[in-house]
Amino acid sequence: MNPKNIKMSAGILALNRIKKQQLKEIPDKLKPENIHDAYKIQEQMHNIFQEINFGKRIGYKIGCTSSVMRKYLDINEPCYGGILNTGTNYISANKNFQDFSMPGVEIEIAVFVNEDFKFSNETTIDEIPLDKLTLFPAIELVDNRWIDYKIIDKNSLIADDFFASEIILGNPLPSHKINNLDNLTGKLIINEDQVSEGNTKNIMKHPI
C-alpha cells in the first residue's frame, strides 16, 4: 500500500473508534493487502491518536494466543494491538457500556519489561530473564468495532488494534515470586457466578 492509502485507512479506523461506532468494513481500495500493511495502518492510527490527544501507545496486547481463539477467529498466528495510556486503569475502574461499541471482558496476564531486550525468532523461554519482568493480573476490555467481525479479514482486524480497547491492572508481582508460571489458573467471576476459566499452559504452552 502507498503511504496515502495507509493514512486514509488509519483515519477511517481512528474516527470510527473515537465516535464509538461499528464499521461494516474498510473500503476495498484501502484494505491492508498483507500483514505488513496491517501493522503500518495500525501504527499510523496510533500516531493519529497521539496527535489529537486521544491516547498514547504505551504497550501492546497480544491476541489469539490460545488455540481455541485462533480456531474461533480462523487465524493461524497471534496478533498484536496497541495499549493506550488513556485506556490503562489500575486496580479498579467504573465504565459505562455506552463508552464502547460492543465490549467484552477477558482475563489476562500483563507483563512490564523493566529494561530493553533484543530477541530473535529462535529465542527460547530459558533465554528470557524473568527476573527483569513484573507481572500483573489483568482484565482486558475488548471492543468489537465491526458490524460483523466474523466476515472481516485478519489484516483489517489487526489494523484496528485487534479488538484492543482498555486494560485494568491488578497489584504487580515480580515474576520470580510466582511458581509454576506455565500452570496458573484464572477465573472470571461476574456477580458471584464463574463465567470463564483459563490456564496459562494454554497460552502457547507458556505466557511469556
Predicted features by range, described:
Residues 2-206:
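Catalytic-core "active-site belt" of small-molecule-metabolizing enzymes
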